[in-house]
Amino acid sequence: ASSGTALTPDQIRLINRLTKNITVLFDGDAAGMRASLRGIDLILEAGMNVRVCTFPDGDDPDSFARKTPIDELQHYLKDNATDFIRFKANLLMKDAGNDPIKKADVIRDIVVSISKVPDHIQREVYVQECASIMDISEDVLFSTLAQIGKKELQEANKKFVQDKKMEVVKATPEETKEKVNIIY
């Protein structure tokens, strides 16, 4: 359960050792859910299958689990857990309303999450689902996915070059001569 604290990559790695499937549990607080969306992307990056379940207003995962018999709790989770695309679409579209610019931002946000999925087949299925839910063509989503991938690659290359430059700056004069092949 995401209990107001950020989910860390180390925690995700530990969970990933035990299972590839994770259900993130939220209370009904929309602001708290929006703040925790980054955790969903981290889970996706780890190659895990993520579902999301929210609880009725006034209940958080702990209070709901304490007052609900285990079989009812399992039934509730089974019936109410949804994939991350449907969850994000429902949550973020509440704010977007009929504003086309905000709707485009919601779609872009979902596609960024899809871009975190390492498995190409899963990614394609998620694109199909997003297209269906958001009523947009798959071609546009795939094009946006490609743009995101290209941008991330450019950023990774830029960071690599910057890191190499910093190695030269931090190096001793002898190491610097070696790295840039200067002969005195």
Name what the model sees in each region:
Residues 6-184:
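A charged alpha-helical hairpin associated with nucleic-acid processing machineries
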Residues 1-4:
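Short hydrophobic/aromatic-enriched beta-strand-loop microsegments
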